[in-house]
Amino acid sequence: MPEGWKRSNLLDIANYLNGLAMQKFRPADGENGLPVLKIKELRQGSCDASSELCSPSIKPEYIVHDGDVIFSWSGSLLVDLWCGGTCGLNQHLFKVTSEKYPKWFYYIWTAHHLARFIAIAADKATTMGHIKREELAKAEVVIPDTASMERIGGIMQPIYDLIISNRIENRKLSTVRDTILPQLMSGAIDVSDIQL
């Protein structure tokens, strides 16, 4: 290992916050609810009209924003950069954050161990496979020295920023398409005078 680099584990580089049982946090009467981020929404990359709602008054750390790293640790194990809009974090999902390391770093290391986590969950599965927090502590990572981390980050950070930005833009364009296309098809929007 290069001088100044060190071995560590996932729990040392990031915080893995488990979501809430959102059925206990429904919106109050007259309150505009937040969609609930469950495994279904994580897999499809967005919330939709069928997504459950929770109170927007939940603790801020349980609110998911575009660009947050989300790790599904039960059932369908996956890790993703959430770009599906603001929502509430449901149980069986970790919101992954760090005060010490950049997002690209803990995302890459979590994704690196995903295949092993899936195998562990499959071996233990009697009903729904999952991994325990102790598996995160066993998942080894290598931390570069500060100069190397900055050099690598200079390459990785813009790539991850662009991925997040493009996915958010894609979501917004899909919303515009889904709003305008039915109006164009029905003739509610007249485009006959447009010169091409």
Predicted segments with their positions:
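A short beta-sheet element
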Residues: 38-39, 57-116, 120-124, 132-133
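Short, charged, solvent-exposed linker or helix-capping segments at domain edges/interfaces
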Residues: 48-49, 105-107, 151
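Sequence-specific dsDNA recognition surfaces
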Residues: 11-26, 33-66, 83, 88-89
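Short, contiguous acidic/charged loop-to-helix segments that flank catalytic cores in large enzymes
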Residues: 55-57, 96, 160-164
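Extended, charge-rich, solvent-exposed interface segments
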Residues: 127
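Non-catalytic DNA-recognition/assembly elements of restriction-modification systems
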Residues: 1-21, 138, 142, 146-191
